[in-house]
Amino acid sequence: RYLQDYEGWLEKLEQDYTRIPSETKVPTRTYFLIRKSDNKIIGMINIRLALNEKLRKFGGNIGYSIRPTERRKGYNKINLYLGLKICQEYGIKEVLMDCDKYNLGSAKTIQALGGVKTKECYNDEFKETVEFYSIDVDKSLSANKELYEK
């Protein structure tokens, strides 16, 4: 919904940056993944620094996206790795994530970075089955450092 109003989207990001946790909102940081060779925005990652009741149930600490033309090239693994580094800087030890059961690309990305499936349930709001994962941040970063820090 913010694609039509870039300035409004940036304003929302700024509000989320400074927001105190509540039942409906949590402090959030948004980062872009930019390819060095051509300065093209490849993707983004949204990191929620705290979780409220709703985000513990669906959503978790991280949401991400890769430009459709750049999918299936390994960029989201880099995106998630860098996001986990930011989580570590903020003292987040365990990251909770979820994805649609049929989003195999996202599930593979989460699993590649050490995500362990903790449960699966149906989301009535979105009418889909959701898989939930937990990632030990320190363990993931340690295991993947040589692969993603070149």
Language-model region placement:
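GNAT-family acyltransferases
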Residues: 1-61, 86, 128-150
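Conserved acetyl-CoA-binding loop-helix of GNAT-fold acetyltransferases
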Residues: 63-66, 72-85, 108-112
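Conserved G/P- and acidic residue-centered "switch" motifs that form tight phosphate/ATP-binding loops
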Residues: 39, 74, 91, 103
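Conserved beta-strand-loop-alpha-helix junction that forms the acyl-donor binding cleft
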Residues: 97-107
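Conserved GNAT acetyl-CoA-binding A-motif
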Residues: 87-98
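Catalytic cores of nucleotide-sugar-dependent glycosyltransferases that transfer UDP/GDP/TDP-activated
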Residues: 33, 92, 120-123
